[in-house]
Design a protein with these regions (language model features):
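Conserved acetyl-CoA-binding loop-helix of GNAT-fold acetyltransferases
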Residues: 94, 100-113, 136, 140
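Conserved active-site alpha-helix within GNAT-family acetyltransferase domains
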Residues: 117, 129-148
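A short beta-loop-alpha structural element at the N-terminal edge
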Residues: 1-16, 27
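Conserved acyl-donor/pantetheine-binding loop and adjacent beta-alpha core of acyl/acetyltransferases
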Residues: 55, 61-91, 152
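Conserved GNAT acetyl-CoA-binding A-motif
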Residues: 115-127
Length: 166
């Protein structure tokens, strides 16, 4: 398997992965249904989308996302004070059949490296409260629970953050 930065030419593969995963979810509240436009924005600077490929098959993604609107700006929800340059970890998707291989945790760490290289020192993420697998992965990677709130037009989400050390 190969980890690499996704390019605009990978957009359809990412959309397909998102749709396959979303369609298979028994509880749709676990994942926000992402529009093609939102996914395309994850490929545009200053955002970075990392993908794991098994030959020509996209099997997992993770996104470093720099918020452009208040709904996506989780830093302000934290109420932290200090010299922070925040960004978000967003949209971790792992194809069925590739789960349990540590790909989400690998992507979390790789997105952190990208964030540090770009000068970000605080990462925020949201996770559905009933998504124990993702919650455990973020906690194992040192993220701290902040609070539970309604986001994204009515979806309940736990908010987590991590201060990055250069």
């Amino acid at each position: 398997m190969e980890l690499r930065r996704c390019q605009p030419s990978d957009l359809q593969a990412i959309i397909d992965l998102n749709e396959i995963i979303y369609a298979a979810l028994p509880d749709k509240s676990v994942l926000r249904h992402n529009s093609p436009e939102m996914i395309a924005s994850c490929l545009e600077e200053p955002n970075v989308t990392l993908g794991v490929w098994d030959c020509n098959l996209l099997v997992a993604i993770g996104v470093l996302y720099v918020p452009q609107c208040i709904e996506e700006d989780h830093y302000h929800d934290l109420g932290l004070h200090g010299d922070y340059r925040p960004a978000n970890q967003k949209l971790f998707l792992v194809r069925e059949g590739y789960r349990g291989l540590g790909l989400q945790r690998q992507l979390i760490r790789e997105v952190e490296k990208v964030a540090i290289s770009r000068g970000y020192n605080l990462l925020c993420t949201t996770v559905a409260p009933n998504n124990a697998f993702s919650i455990n992965n973020f906690l194992k990677e040192g993220y701290v629970y902040a609070k539970t709130e309604e986001k994204y037009g009515g979806l309940v989400r736990n908010l987590y953050y991590k201060t990055l050390i250069y």
